[in-house]
Amino acid sequence: MEFHNDFLTNPLRVTLYNPAENEYTKTFIFLGSVPANVLQACRKDLQRTPKDKEILQNFYGKDWEKKLSQYVVGGDSDDLDEFEKLFVEDSGEETNVMMPEIETMYSEYSIFPEDTFKDIREKIYVATGVPPYRQHIFFFQNNALQVTYRLMLSGSGVALDIRDYKKEFQQVGGLNIDATMESQKDELYVEALDSFQLIKNIHHIFVADLNTLVAPMRRQISIAIEDNYQFDLLYYGLIMKYWPLLSPDAFKLLIQSPLQMEKQYPALSPSLTSLKKRLLLEQKLINFTYARAQQVVAKYEGNKLTRGTLAVTSAMIKISPLVNIQINVRNVFDLFPATPDIPQLVVFFYSKTGPTVVSKHHITSTEPEKFSNKTFRVPTIILIRYINKKAFILTIQNNGHYFIESNWSENERHDFNSVVSTLNNFINPIIHTINDMGPAAFPRGGSLPLPSNEDIQISISSMSVSTFWPYTLSSKGFTELKSRWREYEQAGIISVRGLQQTGVYNFLFKKGIYSYDPHEIERMIIISSGPGRKMDINVALLQNTYAYLFDTNVAARWETIYGGRNIRIYHRVTDIKIEMFNITQEEFNYLWVYLFVFLDNLITGPDKIMVNKLSQLHDKQQGKGASQLRALQEQDPDLYDLRKYDTQATVYSVLCQHPRPPVIYSEAEVKSMPPAKRKELVKYWNFTEGVPAYYSCPHPDYPHLSLLEGRHPLNYCLPCCQKTKALLGTKRFYINNTCLTKHTFVEQDLEDLNTQTSRHTLSYGKKIPVNRIAFLPHQIADELFSNTIKEPDIFCIVGVEQTMLGISNAGLFYSLARILDLAPKALAVEIAKAANTPQYYILGNGAGNMFSSGAELANFILQTFVEQKNQLLQWDTAWQDIFLDLVAICYDLHCVFFKDKQGDIEFEVSPSTIQKILSPSKKIAIIFDTNEGIYPMAMTQQKRFLKNSEAQYIFTEEDPVMEVIHSMSEFMCKDGWWDIHDVKNIPGYTVTKKLINRHNFCYALLIVSDTDRPIYFPIRLSSYIHDDIPIDFDLRPTDIASFEETWKFIRLFNKHFKQYEIIPSAVLQNMKKEFVGFLSEGKTGLYFYYAPTQTLPATLEKLPIATLTIDPRDIDQAILYPLEEPYPHQDKANKAFYMNHLYKFLLIEFFDVLYGLQSNTTRKRIEDLFQKTDFQKINSVTEFYTKLSDFVDLNDIHTIKHILETTGADHALKVLQKNVFNFDYILLSPLQSYTYDELCQYLKKLLTPRIEFYEDIETIDRGLINIYTSCQYSTLKQPQCEKKRLRIPVNHFENYINILAADILNPLKHSTLLLTGLGVIDDLQFIMRPQEIISVKNKF
């Protein structure tokens, strides 16, 4: 990590320029804090002795004369709108123009690489007396003139060369002005860049002082500005163009009352006395930082005193392709499905209705509206992917730039390299998927480069980073730390805001921070004004972002956005932690040096803190309760932060109360201890770092370390000090030894304990540790089940695990595994197999519908419960219903629940389980769901369970307890309506099939007797059991019994079940005037259907007629089988649709042919020119761009220039060959030289090889061709293509050729033709997938 001030040995030169006379008047050289003899030698100028020259050469090097000279670097300026920064990196060949002999002044104010141009303005002020608002700064980079702001006119850049001032011929008040600026003043926009540019490698700048123009003409100007029109001419035509720091009011004040400027506009004209004082203090502090930087870096980089010195907790990586890429983000969004792994996608694009945001989410997503209200600047798609329960966000812009961001725990200790590696692994599969979309995603060709590609630039930003200083301070020491930052605040290096918390120091670091978005101020102003609220910001803000210097409202917002990076310093027991927020990697390296030089100065040098203020790491003592607990959690949060893994876990401070927590030491600390103290330590483990840790128990009342088992969600053993030492052979001795060896204590370890170790049965209502038992609540044991068991047997509740990674309520899962005597992961594997079924959607009363297939559901079960890679998200409760169904399918086991959430115990049983309980064959498990967790009930004997955990968990018809369960279930189902079992008992009739809906409920029965066609008999939505009656997940059949046959069965049913009598209340008639059924009476009336008949049955003659405009079966059909039965005339409609869009399909084939024909010639010319250019010589480079401009447009020249600047000449040609340019698409102009007939013949010859001719077009599925590309590409299924050729009726081809020729020869049709490259027929029509929910918002 280098930290060097180049301006000390290569000083900044500031030359004052008078535009009125076009002459340079004075040069100021900022020497900074150089040795006294160097300063003296510099100031002698022409009177320097050989000794002086030797001193200067020793300090500045052999080129000292050039560094202290008055050379002007640069020639004529270029049009910044066209050739801004057009030259490659300067190799040393400069156009040096020697200025006339002018006065040179030497300043002792220091310039630093981290100075922004805003800082430079202030330093110019103290050195020259020219206040910031009078400074027009310009300089040269690579022979191109640069300024510190951007002036836009109607969206295009304006050339800003103050040296052209005398070329303006129109005058107002004796000053030359550009009148075009006033005529278009509403289209002007100034973007202030001073705060977003560092001086860095710029060593010579020029300042045009407004006073050189204004002072001689003040009287004339005063008269002119009385007229509003002349004022506008002067302000917009001169002031705003070259001195935009001045608002109209400030300019008027400058002319009329210049001495009032400091009072009225302190930001434009700060107090010179205060500014000098602040800059001298800043110089002192920064010089100290530079002086100590290398020593501190060497001391702390790679320091092993703490568990790592760096932890990135959030970051964004920007990938910038060097090649020009155009992405159709709308199509990427459409073709990319939402899944449980990628549950959310958002796209912003310009649709036929205007700016549009479309979001879609998988039904398992918990934040469906995330990002849909985001402000977008360009067409963009956002994808969110979850890996191992961690969210990664990918943002792709339509120019191929993309951003990857995520968050991490501090304990993961990610550094910059691992962050890049982690995000790369996340992004690669998505990039591959998008690239496989081909021209549908990339209409101009190309693909997204992977982060590992050499043709990209990678930058890390928006980081939050924690770093650690490996010393501790006392409370007084930390107070001293805070007080020492006050100097930095007075120097303007930091800014302290708001109230400070105890043990935390929070401030904003301002100096050298420049990586902001200059447009953020606009967005914040727009948001803050809001609809329906009055905008309280001067309208000038929209035109000039320098408004923060003359408008207090804008200044407050500017400070909020650009006020610096947030830094927090935490006073901890074991070290000092520093958090930095929203920084770049470059800023981290820079801030780290400042912060660690400051901290190291607390313990070294003449200003070090007194020894009694500094705690020694190896001399830890038993602290106060809070500090001791904090120390443990700081050094091993994975062990001591129990709620990190289970939000319901009991915290460590309750499990091990003061003064029993031990003291923890690292290996490095132990090595520095005296041998006697080292012998007192117990070696254990640091779970966060994966290295040994050492513990002591310094409190005299609790001198012995013990390890608590069964408390940590991950089964880690928790250190805690005890009064007595565990005796050999005892249970505690066994547990401690197991923990010290294995670091965990699990169920198997319990089984290995001495079988004689006694464990009492817990009372009901407490949390039950794993493999412990508890009594049932007395109202269940003593009343409900009192006569169902005999001594010595007892009913009990058995403790099982309640949590696992990512799942805070896993008790049911572990209960089922215990009941079935299976390892938990084995259970998950088996039920995952059962979930992979075509009827997966019925599971959990339709909860399976959250997934697109059984395979997806099965994979999600495995990832969640076996691999433990997923959080359950919205599936958090639905999984339990799905698991219960799968266990019933796999093991024919059903569960009943006693739920005790509010102190009142409720019996809960699902309808399907009731059906099973009421049947002869049953296997039932009883589960208690309490506030403390979910546990299985068992029948056992206490001694037997304590010895070998033997117990009965499954109950059948033979167990007396089932009589109680049967009785309670029977009572719950007697609610005044029939169900499947009632219907099965009608004599002479047989139920042949149960019809099941997508929520896994039976909605109707098919019944036969001696008829050929089944009777359709609806029932209330009922659960069902798997018995000898077949089930069918299908629609109501069309071939069913007549009314007479149906009514005969209903009369018999009414006879047997008078309480359920079926009484018709209305006749059902379809649109063909056929009678098809009737509606029964009651709130839950059912629809009875029979075979259609033209004759109204006599039984129903007196009933009202209800017309069915659409048969409910047709609606169900459309939902279940949307593509199987199209509308009667769908083929004709699809064919008409195809013919209406066939010209678009032909156009895209035409352009695809032209792309290949026309770009090759231009590319060959560029490559030849490239080979002839020496990119190390500016003259050769200039000639390259000049010749290039003869046949390539300006946008392509900028693209080529960018490639050369970022890759270097050696690699640039390779990148150029991959890139797509505008000249690839200037296709139509050469064809306009043809006559109409010639062009028709040419087009026919050109396109015939691309056409598959047909006499006529048969059925076409229009739904598959909303997105279309050339038939040459096979990334999409395109029914208009065959054999990679476009299908066209032979009798239509010539007509289309004629239309195309006419359109090409019509210059008004050019833009219309090129728009077909979008390849979308209806941009608001999207693929509808079963598990996706799509919403559309227009953004106006």
From Swiss-Prot:
Signal peptide: none
UniProt keyword Thylakoid present: no
CDD domains (alphabetical): Ubl_ubiquitin_like (cd17039)
A GO CC term attached to the entry: virion component
Subcellular location(s) of the protein: Virion
Keyword vocabulary terms for this entry: Transcription, Transcription regulation, Virion
Family: Belongs to the asfivirus G1340L family.
Summary of the function given for this chain in its UniProt record: Putative initation factor.
Protein name: Early transcription factor large subunit homolog
Species the sequence originates in: African swine fever virus (isolate Pig/Kenya/KEN-50/1950) (ASFV)
